């Protein structure tokens, strides 16, 4: 049985390293053009070259987004861009638009192409269509039931790979093809600049009574009528693998290293546990509890088990649940002195109790008894952005381990 791929996002080089350290098999990222995430830092061509070498040295793959829905003017420079990515050795391009697909085929005929979920693929005939044109993989629309995905895979066999989203934010528009942002703010979601108006709060107003709000709200601040819960399929890894899915995709190129480390680690552990003993695999509830320790909305299984309904939305507000704070990330650990060098992410004091975790292991508790700055002077608090501080940790850790603290607010 070919092992399912865990595909993770990377908004910058540090996040890419985190994704690899915590178990991603492949990483998807955007360049400075033609992608759908303007909010992430994205990668220069030099960065993509470095990332490709870094990933290939570790047996991982790199997929680059080319998934805008372009107008004529937006195609300027795309041929040279494709050529550069091909020469660098990028493993695949993620494409949504048929014109962009044909342009890739024209410039680099053997460049592997993955069809983005923005392509709105919902049936087996469309999968066959893309396969005949030469696509290597199709990312299925999020509106499909898991049984539909399994049936499609059964019919197309190994002629083309099928990818689905497994975790992350959900768009209320069909496969992400939203015009609300463009209409309301002038920011085009199909060009990577979504303002997320689906998360705004709304009230009903009658046109002849401006300023008079009708009392239909679930919350005193308004009605959140399009505010989807986040997708989370950690409880159903076995069913997704057994459906024949080739790749599970995690959303979140603008998320933090802490978010990526936590989510990727949990899915990696679930996937590995399944393949270690498929017949006796049992879902581990602690993995979901770990995922709940990062910033998130309430969770849903989306459309995988039927039509999304009122339980798939958050009506009360548009805020995230933040049960834990990201304290810092380990830059170095001296095994002789047991001194860990940490880069701070949130203010932390001597005397606080924190949790520490790393790739493939359960977290452990730790109380900060003493803290030094980067010049080995004793301090009581690390309160400057990305401040370097040192603490002694007897339990062996490594570079890339994460420190977090329960948020009591």
Predicted regions and their residues:
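Conserved phosphotransfer cores of two-component systems
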Residues: 108
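Surface-exposed amphipathic alpha-helical tracts and adjacent flexible/coil segments at the periphery
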Residues: 1-22, 26-29, 33, 52, ...
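Glycine-rich, positively charged N-terminal anion/phosphate-binding segment
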Residues: 37-54
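Short beta-strand elements of ligand-binding domains
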Residues: 64-66, 95, 115-117
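Alpha-helix capping/helix-boundary segments
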Residues: 99-100
């Amino acid at each position: 049985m070919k092992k399912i791929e865990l595909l993770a996002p990377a908004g910058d080089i540090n996040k890419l390293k985190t994704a690899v350290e915590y178990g991603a098999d492949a990483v998807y990222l955007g360049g400075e053009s033609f992608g759908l995430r303007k909010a992430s830092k994205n990668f220069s061509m030099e960065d993509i070259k470095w990332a490709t070498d870094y990933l290939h040295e570790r047996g991982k793959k790199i997929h680059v987004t080319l998934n805008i829905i372009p107008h004529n003017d937006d195609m300027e420079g795309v041929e040279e861009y494709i050529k550069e990515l091909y020469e660098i050795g990028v493993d695949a391009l993620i494409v949504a638009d048929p014109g962009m697909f044909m342009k890739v085929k024209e410039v680099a005929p053997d460049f592997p192409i993955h069809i983005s979920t923005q392509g709105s693929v919902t049936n087996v005939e469309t999968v066959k269509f893309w396969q005949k044109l030469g696509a290597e993989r199709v990312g299925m629309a999020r509106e499909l039931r898991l049984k539909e995905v399994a049936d499609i895979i059964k019919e197309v066999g190994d002629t083309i790979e099928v990818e689905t989203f497994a975790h992350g934010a959900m768009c209320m528009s069909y496969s992400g093809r939203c015009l609300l942002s463009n209409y309301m703010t002038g920011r085009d979601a199909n060009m990577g600049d979504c303002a997320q108006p689906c998360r705004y709060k709304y009230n009903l107003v009658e046109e002849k009574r401006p300023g008079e709000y009708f009392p239909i709200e679930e919350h005193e601040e308004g009605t959140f009528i399009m505010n989807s819960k986040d997708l989370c399929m950690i409880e159903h890894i076995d069913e997704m693998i057994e459906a024949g899915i080739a790749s599970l995709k995690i959303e979140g190129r603008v998320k933090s290293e802490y978010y990526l480390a936590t989510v990727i680690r949990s899915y990696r552990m679930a996937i590995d546990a399944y393949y270690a003993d498929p017949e006796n695999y049992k879902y581990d509830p602690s993995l979901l509890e770990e995922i709940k320790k990062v910033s998130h909305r309430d969770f849903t299984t989306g459309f995988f088990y039927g039509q999304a309904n009122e339980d798939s939305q958050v009506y009360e507000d548009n805020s995230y649940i933040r049960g834990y704070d990201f304290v810092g990330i380990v830059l170095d650990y001296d095994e002789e002195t047991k001194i860990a060098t940490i880069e701070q992410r949130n203010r932390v004091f001597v005397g606080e109790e924190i949790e520490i975790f790393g790739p493939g292991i359960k977290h452990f508790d730790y109380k900060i008894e003493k803290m030094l700055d980067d010049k080995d002077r004793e301090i009581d608090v690390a309160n400057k952005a990305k401040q370097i501080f040192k603490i002694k940790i007897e339990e062996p850790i490594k570079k890339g381990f994460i420190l977090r603290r329960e948020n009591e607010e």
